[in-house]
Structure formats: structure tokens, C-alpha cells
């Protein structure tokens, strides 16, 4: 049982108003940060990436599906894996409901993994997701965006989340954003990794409102409790 200070309604309201002022300050700071994110310079994508999709091979530009903006989630599912990463699966449970709303704002959404397409399709059917999920197998895409690494590099130093660190797996999570101009030229505008993906997990935002919060302090690692939703 949680032990907590108990006060009158009037005292609670006073403290809640004080916290509300901080919450509003945080919201304004987040809005400013989002504006700065949009002002980042872009990098032209020159490499001709090709993906295996249920509709055949498609280029990166073709994944935009008529939109000018593309969100890519880099899902940890490598060649030969029997199932996808539990943490990526936790995050992916939030995708299907958001996609129609993203489409209304000129945004296409696709999940990319390095596993061959039949392996992706098998896991997708098992879980029951509907979002578009394509394979970058045989291309440099995952490696160029620092979410896949040669097996020999696992346990040694590599670049992930814009720093040099020990690589713990040959597949890592991330999200990358792209823009396509009217001429069809594609630009990379943003990528985030690790805790940078935290804001995308709606369930975490709900947990942050509860008395126990995420309740992960005593776990071996923060997401040790996470299970795929069919388990």
C-alpha cells in the first residue's frame, strides 16, 4: 500500500494549481523545442534505397504514398528472428489508431525492419497489426540510419543515438522523418533513438499520471515488464 500525505480539498487544490503552473511552463518549453526541431537543416537522400513491400519493390520516395512527409519507425526485427522486440511491439501497439490522423496532416507512416518480408508478415499476422510494414533486407537503409549493426560489432563500440557507445544488439530502435519536395527529391529531416522515442508511447503518458507512475525503479531495466500483447 502506498503511504502518502493526506490533506483537505482546499490544500490539495492550492498545490494542484502550483503544479499546473509548472505543467504549463513545460508545455510552452516543449512547443518551443518542437519549433526548433522543425528548423533543423535537412540532408538530401541520394542513395537509391529499395524496400520489399506486399505490393512489390518500392523506393523510399514511393513509400510517401502521395504525401509530402514520411514517418519511418525502425522496428527491431532482424533476419531469422522468431519474433519482434517486445519494447518495439509495445510502441507499435500505438500505431494503427494514429495513422488515419497523420494522413489528414499530409503524413505517411511506415514501419521498416531488416528481416525478409515473409518473416515480417508472419509476425504481423500473429500480433494483428494493420500498419504498413516493409523490409529493408539487402539494402544499407538500416545501417545508414544507425539502427542496424554487423554482428561482429555487437559488444564493441559503435554510433547510436548520436554518440559512441557499446552496441548491445545488431538491431536497435529508432524513428526517422523524411520530406519529399514537388520534384520528388527526398530529404532526411530528423531521427530519434532510445529515450527520444519515449514521447511516442501513449501508455507511458497515462502511467505518468498515476500514483505509482511507471513503477520501474526496481526492475533490471526500465521495460523489463513489457510483453507483446498476445502473451
Tell me the role of every PLM-derived stretch.
Residues 1-70, 75-105, 122-128, 132, ...:
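Non-globular targeting/processing and membrane-anchoring segments
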Amino acid at each position: 500500500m502506498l503511504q502518502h500525505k493526506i490533506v483537505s480539498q482546499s490544500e490539495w487544490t492550492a498545490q494542484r494549481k502550483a503544479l499546473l503552473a509548472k505543467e504549463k511552463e513545460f508545455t510552452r518549453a516543449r512547443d518551443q523545442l518542437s519549433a526548433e526541431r522543425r528548423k533543423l537543416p535537412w540532408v538530401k537522400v541520394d542513395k537509391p534505397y529499395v524496400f520489399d513491400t506486399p505490393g512489390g519493390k518500392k523506393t523510399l520516395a514511393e513509400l510517401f504514398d502521395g504525401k509530402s512527409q514520411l514517418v519511418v519507425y525502425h522496428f527491431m526485427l532482424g533476419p531469422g528472428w522468431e519474433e519482434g522486440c517486445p519494447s518495439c511491439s509495445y510502441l507499435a501497439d500505438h500505431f494503427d489508431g494514429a495513422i488515419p490522423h497523420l494522413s489528414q496532416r499530409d503524413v505517411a507512416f511506415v514501419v521498416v525492419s531488416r528481416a525478409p518480408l515473409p518473416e515480417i508478415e508472419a509476425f504481423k499476422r500473429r500480433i494483428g497489426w494493420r500498419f504498413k510494414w516493409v523490409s529493408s533486407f539487402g539494402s544499407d537503409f538500416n545501417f545508414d540510419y544507425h539502427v542496424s549493426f554487423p554482428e561482429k560489432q555487437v559488444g564493441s563500440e559503435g554510433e547510436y543515438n548520436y554518440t559512441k557507445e557499446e552496441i548491445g544488439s545488431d538491431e536497435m530502435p529508432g524513428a526517422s522523418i523524411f520530406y519529399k519536395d514537388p520534384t520528388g527529391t527526398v530529404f532526411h529531416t530528423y531521427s530519434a533513438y532510445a529515450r527520444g522515442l519515449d514521447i511516442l508511447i501513449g501508455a507511458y503518458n497515462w502511467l505518468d499520471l498515476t500514483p505509482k507512475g511507471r513503477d520501474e525503479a526496481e526492475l533490471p531495466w526500465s521495460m523489463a515488464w513489457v510483453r507483446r500483447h498476445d502473451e
